[in-house]
């Protein structure tokens, strides 16, 4: 189901998904669809999650960020700069051409590359590094704030007091 259909479902007065106790988390490029009151939030960034991390991985490559490339997991599994250049970067740079030639949706091609079983462990490390990157702190805090807001709404829907959960956790 696409973001547009999800938004329509969540905003539909007849379906009244708010009464179903659900939240929706969309890609960052769907930011205009964000509606906290309808429990719709967006992932950080103003792009699809795939494009965000394709771009970030290219930045890590082009700037030769040593503390990323020297990660023991990456080194132990052969995810070197050369491997990235010869495999993932080539795939990323061919997305527009592939979409044009195959008449496929660019978004689907992005997802296929991002979720490729050979690339996914690499992208997990890219995501981890992005989360820890101080440059992303502001956008992450905004997402976390939105996530907490919709989570509180969901807890309230189910009759669970958020403050009670915090107190119980602190007592453990």
Predicted regions and their residues:
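Acidic, Mg2+-coordinating catalytic modules of nucleic-acid enzymes
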Residues: 1-172
């Amino acid at each position: 189901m696409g973001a547009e259909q999800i938004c329509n479902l969540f905003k539909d007065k007849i379906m009244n998904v708010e009464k179903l106790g659900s939240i929706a988390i969309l890609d960052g490029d769907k930011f205009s669809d964000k509606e906290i009151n309808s429990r719709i939030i967006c992932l950080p960034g103003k792009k699809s999650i795939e494009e965000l991390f394709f771009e970030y991985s290219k930045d890590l490559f082009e700037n030769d960020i040593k503390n990323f490339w020297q990660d023991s997991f990456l080194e132990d599994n052969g995810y070197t700069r050369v491997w990235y250049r010869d495999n993932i970067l080539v795939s990323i740079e061919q997305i527009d051409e592939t979409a044009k030639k195959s008449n496929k949706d660019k978004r689907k091609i992005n997802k296929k590359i991002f979720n490729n079983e050979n690339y996914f462990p690499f992208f997990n490390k890219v995501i981890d590094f992005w989360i820890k990157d101080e440059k992303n702190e502001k956008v992450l805090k905004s997402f976390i704030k939105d996530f907490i807001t919709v989570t509180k709404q969901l807890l309230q829907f189910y009759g669970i007091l958020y403050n009670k959960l915090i107190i119980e956790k602190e007592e453990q």
